[in-house]
């Protein structure tokens, strides 16, 4: 369906056309008419499907710009998502004259208060900062007509449930509420029951939770071999833009440093970075000044960056929903992408949990060899030399070196000179700088009937799952080769001893339901 068939005003349609959009995405096509009718909506769709426009366009349509009041509130999980949503809402509402402000932690609250006083029709913010402003009476909610919860599952995972409930309780009851989430855990459903009026459900089928445009692979690799395995794959694939996910802030810092040592243009983002640096890194990544962005799950929430071709899960995510969000960074706007997850041998059971959620089976991928990496880097160097020789600006400087060049040509053969140039351009695989990445414990192995080991049907933790993988691998190119033989008693005994020596606190209900055990820093 085209946007001009959705009963939107001429002002909005003009801005939509300027942005180059013609066809509405499925979530937009189904949500916009319901929202324009004033109905509450719960929308479930993967990231990158146009959720901001799905709630933003009908919200902008209802704004009365002649009234200097805050009429809509958008709650977002992270600073980055708040800024991006504010920018998109401002872009679409520009012709209509809608004022949109964003508020978030890590920036001066005084400046944000001043901006709110200067006028706003829509406010986009993170839960903590919104509550601060409400308590200071700098954010007045009495005229709110539309409340939007964006990436609701992420706000839940980040522990914002109480803050969200506190904010909702202060918004007028006769409001319209729009809730969007990539996944729909029970706590999110309870919000719908408690705070929404007969909401309409718009849902992307589970089989589409991860887009078909993303080829999903995994590599079974030991912890100490992950970094070299990943960088060789990058050498071979030569991704235009890649995001690498690490589980901790320390991991992000170490990976960023290591990638720079190996010659990649890389920067990292995590919660400890100040806001100015985070925005600078993201701007450089969007503009192509960086090849690789390294991030924690929290720091990457809601990133809307076009052109990401590869996602590397250096650490397997701690919950399956995070996997959906991670790979949603690629395969956007009709373009294909690739995700590669590195899995320690005793983390194999976690893949089935992810697959149960995404309804898509990951393919085993064979690691690239040292020689394949070296050959790829040489090809890149040769192409760069060819491009430079075709550049008239570069060739104009050649004559400055004419006398010295002729002297070298008299002493050495063209082949020797070419080999020397390549040796300066391409890192020798035998002399690559060493990179140390601190080892972290793999996710805890937890045998059960849900794919974490034992004898779960089709589970990856048991022998049958591996045998199926071996059969799938044959004839399918670069697939992972599994060791043959028993994975039974010896492994079970080791896991039994591991569990005995690493007793965990009692599991919460959500941990029992998902199978994932998340502990605070310092817990064994």
From Swiss-Prot:
It is an enzyme of class 3 (hydrolase). It catalyses: ATP + H2O = ADP + phosphate + H(+). One of its GO terms (cellular component) is plasma membrane. It comes from the Bacteria. A motif (DEAD box) lies at residues 150-153. Coiled coil: none annotated. GO terms for biological process: response to cold; RNA catabolic process. A motif (Q motif) lies at residues 1-29. Residues 213-373 form the Helicase C-terminal domain. It is a peripheral membrane protein. The keyword Cell membrane applies. InterPro entries: DEAD/DEAH_box_helicase_dom, DEAD_box_RNA_helicases, DEAD_helicase_CshA, Helicase_ATP-bd, Helicase_C-like, P-loop_NTPase, RNA-helicase_DEAD-box_CS, RNA_helicase_DEAD_Q_motif. Pfam families: DEAD, Helicase_C. GO terms for molecular function: ATP binding; ATP hydrolysis activity; RNA helicase activity; RNA strand annealing activity. Its EC number is 3.6.4.13. Residues 440-524 are annotated as: Disordered. It is found in: Cytoplasm; Cell membrane. Residues 32-202 form the Helicase ATP-binding domain. The keyword Translocase does not apply. Keywords: ATP-binding, Cell membrane, Cytoplasm, Helicase, Hydrolase, Membrane, Nucleotide-binding, RNA-binding, Stress response. ATP binds at residues 45-52. Residues 463-498 have a biased composition (Basic and acidic residues). Belongs to the DEAD box helicase family. CshA subfamily. Oligomerizes, may be a member of the RNA degradosome. HAMAP family: DEAD_helicase_CshA. This is DEAD-box ATP-dependent RNA helicase CshA. It comes from Streptococcus pneumoniae (strain ATCC BAA-255 / R6). The gene is cshA.
């Amino acid at each position: 369906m085209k946007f001009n068939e959705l009963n939107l005003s001429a002002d909005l349609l003009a801005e939509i056309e300027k942005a180059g959009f013609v066809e509405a995405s499925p979530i937009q096509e189904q949500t916009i008419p319901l929202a324009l009718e004033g109905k509450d909506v719960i929308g479930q769709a993967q990231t990158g499907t146009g959720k901001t426009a799905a709630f933003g366009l009908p919200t902008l349509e209802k704004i009365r710009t002649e009234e200097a009041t805050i009429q809509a509130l958008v709650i977002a999980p992270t600073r980055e998502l708040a800024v991006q949503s504010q920018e998109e809402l401002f872009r679409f509402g520009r012709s209509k004259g809608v004022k949109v402000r964003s508020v978030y932690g890590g920036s001066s609250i005084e400046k944000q208060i001043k901006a709110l006083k200067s006028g706003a029709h829509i406010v986009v913010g993170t839960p903590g900062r919104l509550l601060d402003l409400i308590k200071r009476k700098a954010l007045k909610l009495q005229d709110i007509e539309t409340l939007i919860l964006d990436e609701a599952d992420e706000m839940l995972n980040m522990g914002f449930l109480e803050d969200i409930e506190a904010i909702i309780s202060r918004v007028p009851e006769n409001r319209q509420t729009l809730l969007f989430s990539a996944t729909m855990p029970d706590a999110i459903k309870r919000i719908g029951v408690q705070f929404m009026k007969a909401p309409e459900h718009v849902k992307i089928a589970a089989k589409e939770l991860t887009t078909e445009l993303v080829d999903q692979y995994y590599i079974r690799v030991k912890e100490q071999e992950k970094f070299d395995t990943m960088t060789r794959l990058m050498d071979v694939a030569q991704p235009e833009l890649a995001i690498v996910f690490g589980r901790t802030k320390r991991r992000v810092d170490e990976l960023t440093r290591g990638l720079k040592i190996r010659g990649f243009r890389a920067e990292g983002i995590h919660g400890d970075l100040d806001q100015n640096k985070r925005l600078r890194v993201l701007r450089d990544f969007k503009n192509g000044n960086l090849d690789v962005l390294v991030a924690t799950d929290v720091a990457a929430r809601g990133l809307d960056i076009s052109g990401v071709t590869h996602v590397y899960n250096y650490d397997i995510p701690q919950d399956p929903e995070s996997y959906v969000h991670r790979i949603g960074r690629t395969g956007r706007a009709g373009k294909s992408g690739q995700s590669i997850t590195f899995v320690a041998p005793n983390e194999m059971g976690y893949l089935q949990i992810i697959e149960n959620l995404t309804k898509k089976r990951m393919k085993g991928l064979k690691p690239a060899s040292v020689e394949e990496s070296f050959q790829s880097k040489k090809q890149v160097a040769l192409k760069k030399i060819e491009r430079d020789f075709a550049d008239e600006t570069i060739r104009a400087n050649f004559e400055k070196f004419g006398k010295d060049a002729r002297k070298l040509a008299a002493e050495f053969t063209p082949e020797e000179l070419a080999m020397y140039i390549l040796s300066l351009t391409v890192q020798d695989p035998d002399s690559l700088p060493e990179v140390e990445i601190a080892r972290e414990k793999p996710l805890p192995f937890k045998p059960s009937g849900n794919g974490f080991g034992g004898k779960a049907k089709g589970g990856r933790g048991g022998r049958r799952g591996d045998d199926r993988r071996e059969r799938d691998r044959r004839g399918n190119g670069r697939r992972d080769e599994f060791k043959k033989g028993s994975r039974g008693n010896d492994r079970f005994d080791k896991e039994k001893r591991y569990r005995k020596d690493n007793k965990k606190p009692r599991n919460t209900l959500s941990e029992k339901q998902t199978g994932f055990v998340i502990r605070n820093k310092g817990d064994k």
